[in-house]
Curated annotation (Swiss-Prot):
GO terms for cellular component: cytosol; keratin filament. InterPro entries: Keratin_matx (IPR007659), KRTAP_PMG (IPR007951). In the wool cortex, wool keratin intermediate filaments are embedded in an interfilamentous matrix, consisting of wool keratin-associated proteins (KRTAP), which are essential for the formation of a rigid and resistant wool shaft through their extensive disulfide bond cross-linking with abundant cysteine residues of wool keratins. The matrix proteins include the high-sulfur and high-glycine-tyrosine keratins. Wool. It comes from the Eukaryota. Sequence repeats lie at residues 107-116, 117-126, 127-136, 137-146. The gene is KRTAP11-1. Keywords: Keratin, Repeat. One of its GO terms (molecular function) is structural molecule activity. Pfam families: PMG. This is Keratin-associated protein 11-1. It comes from Capra hircus. Residues 107-146 are annotated as: 4 X 10 AA approximate repeats.
């Protein structure tokens, strides 16, 4: 199943530091929404915190039960990624919009609006600590939740 990415906007900062990288924007129908953040390779290290990321993806014309496919995160075991993903399902006119915060060390936010996150191969809810970042790995759901259960029940991002 293919997805097309219409826009992608990200900014970055060092963990525990000030903003040091300007906003990076990718606008291309060929861009893969699910493969990671478009940043120069020198910034794709464990010392960078990627935040304020927003992706707009278009699903096929059939309403799907998942908003996006499971894909691996950036390979660095200490990479912290915070992104807000908007999935639009047509013809269901369903919008799934929620920020996800996770550490790419085998943690996965679970389906739906669950605030539980667990490492893929363990029942523990504690993830590897990264600097001053909280050791609890969980998706952060926004105040505004526009969910339609039929389309979003298994919406998840696996890293």
């Amino acid at each position: 199943m293919s997805y097309s990415c219409s826009t992608r906007n990200c900014s970055s900062r060092r963990i525990g530091g000030e903003y040091a990288v300007p906003v990076v924007t990718v606008s291309s129908p060929e861009a893969d929404c699910l493969s990671g953040i478009y940043l120069p390779s020198s910034f794709q290290t464990g010392s960078w915190l990627l935040d304020h990321c927003q992706e707009t993806c278009c699903e096929p014309t059939v309403c799907q039960s998942t908003c996006y496919q499971p894909t691996p995160c950036v390979s660095s075991p200490v990479q912290v990624t915070s992104r807000q993903t908007t999935c639009v399902s047509s013809p269901c006119s369903t919008t799934c919009s929620r920020p996800l915060t996770f550490i790419s060390s085998g943690c996965q936010p679970l389906s739906g609006v669950s605030t539980v996150c667990k490492p893929v191969r363990s029942i523990s809810t504690v993830c590897q600590p990264v600097g001053g970042v909280s050791t609890i790995c969980q998706p952060t759901c926004g105040v505004s939740r526009t969910y339609q259960q039929s389309c979003v029940s298994s919406c998840r991002r696996i890293c």
